[in-house]
From Swiss-Prot:
Belongs to the SfsA family. GO terms for molecular function: DNA binding. Coiled coil: none annotated. Gene3D superfamilies: 2.40.50.580, 3.40.1350.60. Pfam families: SfsA (PF03749), SfsA_N (PF17746). This is Sugar fermentation stimulation protein homolog.
Amino acid sequence: MKITKNILKAEFIKRPNRFQAYVKINEKIEMVHVPNTGRCKEILIPGSMVILREENNENRKTRYDLIAGYKGDMLINIDSQIPNKVVHEALMNLKIDILKEYTNIKREKTFGKSRFDFKLEKENGEIYYLEVKGVTLENDGLTMFPDAPTERGTKHILELIDVKNKGMGAGVLFLIQLNGVKKFTPHHKMDKNFGEALRLAKEKGVDILAYDCLVEESSISLNNPISIEI
């Protein structure tokens, strides 16, 4: 998918809280919005190059969103709104093999006490609930989720087990917001409960999927399935 708004580069200075950061644009320091509540400490390093998206919304305090950052030569998209859009585009274009037969695609649908990112349906009425998690944490080709504890994420995984137990299809797709990685695994040291829930979900028949992305400064799209170790 193309990022149609104005894109520009900046130097990262600091991130005083989850939602705000300071960057340098043409020698001027500017506060920007960070659309990601994760830590992103391996990406948002003082002096590193980041990518901004200009919003031009008079009702906002900040003019720009910080949507990506360079880790060496590797560009990592950190916009938490992007994964659902990328996966929706991939579903519409039949790029996810095990989900190609689900032609009715609905977004943000509730089941039980959770709202899942997608409710998919085949022509014969079979239903499948899909949850999407964006992944930005990488170390030597190994990607992990989460990069901060996530009770909400664990709740989603347990609800997917309930979906499966009720005879419907269920899956979680980890969208790795970078390219050229080797493997995905849950980040047990960061959130043991999430890792245990994911392992249980796999045992109960929930599909666990991971895909990397082709990431450029002004575009991002689904790329290839990635090996998973749980």
